[in-house]
């Protein structure tokens, strides 16, 4: 069965972990901050009643989320790694490079970024940059189904297909962008409507 790594467990990472565990998917979590596990417990306690109303999958449980001490352990057997670290390009590049070296070769590496381009994010991914995408959610992640899936110039079609399948199977509505643009689609629509 699928397992997913959530790297960076702030508000967005905790939202993703809540969403995936509510769909019965095993989640491997990592964050450098030791308090992140408490934040997740608080997030999922608040989220679970709303998620129950929307409908949980068979086998859904907050206990599906396991925290790891090392990022390498969190990502090693996953089909998707969802990176949701703070919006600092150098930090994301460093994390994605580490993930790229540690995860399986057919694993999709997705960043939750709301602003950076795949081509910049994947700059230091030397193993398989063709499997890096942006998977940009809307907050709260466990309630709003839309995810923008964005390819970079090196991203392979098979990576996009796999990412779309994983997100769709977890109950997400995927807006697929084959070319990267500044600001993605939904954010631009929001700006245009103002």
Task: Identify the meaning behind each predicted range.
Residues 1-54:
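NAD(P)+-binding Rossmann beta1-loop-alpha1 motif at the extreme N-terminus of oxidoreductases
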Residues 4, 18, 22, 61-83, ...:
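Amphipathic alpha-helical segments at domain termini/boundaries
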Residues 17-18, 41-42, 93-96, 121-123, ...:
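Short amphipathic alpha-helical segments
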Residues 32-35, 39, 49-108, 116-117:
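Rossmann-like NAD(P)-binding element
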Residues 108-179, 183, 187:
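Rossmann-fold dinucleotide-binding core
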Residues 188-194:
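Internal nucleotide-binding/catalytic subdomain
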């Amino acid at each position: 069965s699928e397992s997913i790594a959530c790297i960076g467990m702030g508000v967005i990472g905790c939202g993703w972990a809540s969403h995936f565990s509510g769909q019965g998917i095993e989640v491997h979590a990592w964050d450098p901050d030791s308090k992140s596990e408490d934040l997740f417990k608080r997030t999922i306690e608040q989220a679970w009643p709303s998620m129950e109303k929307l409908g949980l999958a068979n086998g859904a449980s907050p206990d599906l989320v396991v925290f790891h001490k090392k990022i390498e352990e969190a990502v090693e057997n996953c089909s998707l790694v969802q990176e949701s670290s703070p919006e600092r390009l150098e930090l994301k590049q460093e994390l994605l490079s580490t993930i790229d070296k540690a995860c399986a070769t057919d694993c999709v590496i997705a960043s939750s970024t709301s602003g950076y381009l795949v081509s910049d994010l994947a700059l230091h991914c030397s193993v398989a940059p063709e499997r890096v995408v942006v998977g940009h959610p809307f907050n709260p992640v466990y309630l709003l189904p839309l995810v923008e899936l964005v390819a970079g110039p090196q991203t392979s079609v098979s990576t996009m297909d796999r990412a779309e399948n994983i997100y769709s199977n977890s109950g997400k509505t995927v807006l697929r962008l084959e070319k990267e643009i500044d600001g993605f689609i939904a954010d631009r629509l929001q700006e245009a409507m103002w």
